[in-house]
């Protein structure tokens, strides 16, 4: 099994956000921030952006992961889709990619390695992105991903730090991928739920490229290793707002709620909860299993969009017509100005109820 080579799969293998923050604090930023560097390390965004002229900016990212499935082709597809998503999450369009790969070459058969690479190539072809080479090493754990270059107009960049008071939120996919992945690893995921799982992790978030053209879309990111809660905190902190969300309206994959009750969470869900402790607030009497659903790490999760209320209906309609049938908006969500560095993301069961902080 490919998953037997790794201690965590997909975006669940990411370094915990608290440890990452400490690590990066010890690494100085570029001594002279180039004026053309429009997006760098400031807010932990999905990609870097460098302006090359008045009409064009380059979007650059790299993303790789360990297996969260045993099928090598599906692993390659999921890793590639997840990497491309970072460019889409900036409002950009990918134009080229190169592969990043590492395998225990003496333990994994060559045909399985070829299937991983074929999966990545097929996803790039589906997205119209040439895969122009890469770099491969002998490594104890299988890893695969992409370095991706995209393009965006400098005035249409979408960051994770531009939400405004009064914005609404749209999420384009249900939650629960980390739970489904954990259930798969212990042979507790039924076949029909596995098929849903595969469809989600290989679905390309290409809607981000046209969301960049909509001025009323203020902030954009993809929901990945830090879970919905973590990415909401990052988004709220960057804009200095507080986001409140009605948690019982958040869509979940069919098996996720029962798996949560059974405690089938990946380690990343617990690490995320600890890392964002103090910046999250949940409704009264919530048990830990309910809370962990929102810190569950997603692999190639949906887009997280904040936008002006008047644009919600038209954006939702377009999402539903263009491959995001489960996209949902939170008209009961509010962003409130705050001067305190706590409870940036508030989850409650009724609009205005629970939560606090």
Language-model segments: which ranges?
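Hydrophobic alpha-helical segments, chiefly the membrane-spanning helices
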Residues: 343-357
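Conserved small/polar residues in nucleotide/adenosyl-binding loops
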Residues: 331-338, 355-357
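Helix-biased detector of long, well-ordered alpha-helical tracts
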Residues: 1-334
């Amino acid at each position: 099994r490919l998953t037997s080579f790794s201690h965590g799969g997909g975006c669940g293998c990411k370094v915990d956000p608290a440890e990452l923050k400490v690590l990066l604090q010890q690494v100085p930023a570029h001594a002279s921030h180039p004026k053309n560097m429009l997006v760098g390390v400031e807010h932990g965004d999905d990609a870097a952006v460098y302006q090359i002229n008045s009409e064009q900016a380059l979007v650059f990212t790299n993303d790789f992961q360990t297996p969260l499935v045993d099928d090598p082709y599906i692993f390659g597809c999921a890793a590639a889709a997840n990497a491309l998503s970072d460019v889409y999450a900036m409002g950009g369009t990918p134009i080229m990619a190169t592969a990043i790969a590492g395998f225990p070459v003496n333990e994994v058969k060559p045909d399985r390695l070829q299937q991983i690479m074929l999966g990545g190539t097929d996803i790039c072809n589906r997205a119209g992105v040439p895969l122009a080479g890469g770099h491969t090493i002998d490594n104890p754990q299988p890893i695969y991903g992409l370095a991706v270059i995209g393009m965006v107009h400098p005035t249409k960049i979408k960051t994770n730090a531009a939400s405004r008071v009064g914005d609404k939120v749209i999420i384009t996919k249900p939650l629960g991928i980390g739970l489904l992945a954990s259930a798969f690893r212990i042979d507790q995921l039924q076949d029909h739920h596995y098929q849903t799982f595969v469809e989600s992790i290989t679905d390309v978030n290409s809607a981000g490229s046209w969301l960049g053209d909509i001025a009323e879309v203020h902030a954009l990111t993809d929901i990945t290793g830090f879970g919905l809660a973590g990415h909401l905190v990052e988004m709220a902190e960057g804009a200095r707002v507080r986001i409140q969300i009605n948690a019982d309206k958040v869509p979940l994959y069919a098996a996720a709620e029962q798996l949560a009750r059974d405690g089938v969470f990946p380690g990343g869900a617990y690490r995320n909860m600890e890392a964002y402790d103090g910046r999250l607030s949940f409704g009264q009497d919530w048990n830990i299993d309910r809370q962990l659903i929102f810190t569950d790490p997603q692999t190639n999760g949906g887009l997280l969009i904040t936008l002006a209320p008047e644009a919600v209906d038209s954006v939702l309609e377009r999402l539903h017509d263009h491959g995001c049938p489960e996209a949902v908006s939170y008209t009961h969500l509010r962003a409130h100005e705050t001067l305190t560095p706590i409870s940036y993301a508030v989850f409650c069961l009724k609009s205005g109820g629970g939560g606090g902080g």
